[in-house]
A protein has these predicted regions:
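Structured, hydrophobic secondary-structure cores that serve as assembly/anchoring elements
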Residues: 1-189
């Protein structure tokens, strides 16, 4: 038997998947032409490997798939812990920096401001909505510094898409016409 690390196949899968979509799980994380994994993992072992910053490969539902969308960031910011969010913000930042660098050294007049604003809104509109990169956005500030005139402030609030990871199921009911009720809650991690 030949055992090959899945990193190259996963990298190709990440490259071809929409940037805002995590390449993990049955639908988006399945690796083609792979027959199995070196060893099977339990749910608790998958969670432990993910908490260590590793991407566990799992053989479930007749398919080998990646089972994590985390980055190596271990702080409190959930966005920085999710690689699809980091990729989207990095892409948007690079596009805007390139665009604004091309517009550098133009006199910042009302006409220039309006033109730049329209082009930024047009770009952000093109990446907003389902099957795109962000859910919505708001330009909160686009103005010239009143004291240092060569400094322009641009504050954009974007709402990225986050992958569903934990499903919490709650059920309740009663037996026949009796008042005997029962409650149960399930949590999968």
């Amino acid at each position: 038997d030949l055992f090959v690390p899945p990193s190259a196949a996963l990298a190709g899968k990440i490259y071809k998947t929409l940037m805002s979509q995590v390449t993990a799980g049955k639908k988006f994380g399945g690796i083609n032409e792979v027959e199995g994994v070196r060893f099977d993992l339990k749910k608790s072992e998958i969670a432990n490997l993910e908490s260590l910053g590793l991407i566990p490969m799992v053989n479930e539902y007749g398919k080998v798939m990646a089972f994590s969308g985390k980055t190596l960031f271990n702080g409190d910011n959930l966005g920085l812990q999710t690689y699809s969010v980091v990729r989207v913000f990095d892409y948007v930042t690079k596009v805007l920096m390139d665009f604004l660098n091309r517009r550098a050294f133009e006199n910042f007049t009302a006409t220039t401001r309006k033109d730049i604003m329209n082009q930024i809104v047009q770009f952000l509109d093109s990446i907003t909505g389902p099957k795109n990169l962000i859910e919505n956005f708001e330009i909160r500030r686009f103005e010239q510094d009143p004291k240092q005139k060569d400094r322009i402030y641009l504050d954009i609030h974007m709402k990225p898409y986050f992958p569903a990871k934990n499903f919490l199921i709650k059920m309740d009911g009663h037996k026949g016409t009796d008042a005997n009720e029962w409650d149960t809650e399930y949590e999968q991690k």
